[in-house]
UniProtKB/Swiss-Prot annotation:
Coiled coil: none annotated. Expressed by the venom gland. Its main location: secreted. GO terms for molecular function: ion channel inhibitor activity; potassium channel regulator activity; toxin activity. The keyword Disulfide bond applies. This is Potassium channel toxin alpha-KTx 2.10. The lineage of its organism: Eukaryota, Metazoa, Ecdysozoa, Arthropoda, Chelicerata. InterPro entries: Scorpion_toxin-like_sf, Scorpion_toxinS_K_inh.
Amino acid sequence: IFINVKCSLPQQCLRPCKDRFGQHAGGKCINGKCKCYP
């Protein structure tokens, strides 16, 4: 699931993804945007 958060590193996506989808969520940075894996 893509969220509207800009990124340049995967680590930048972990916190926003966890905030939205819970502690077990993961995140990657794809084409400058965060993609969450709930």
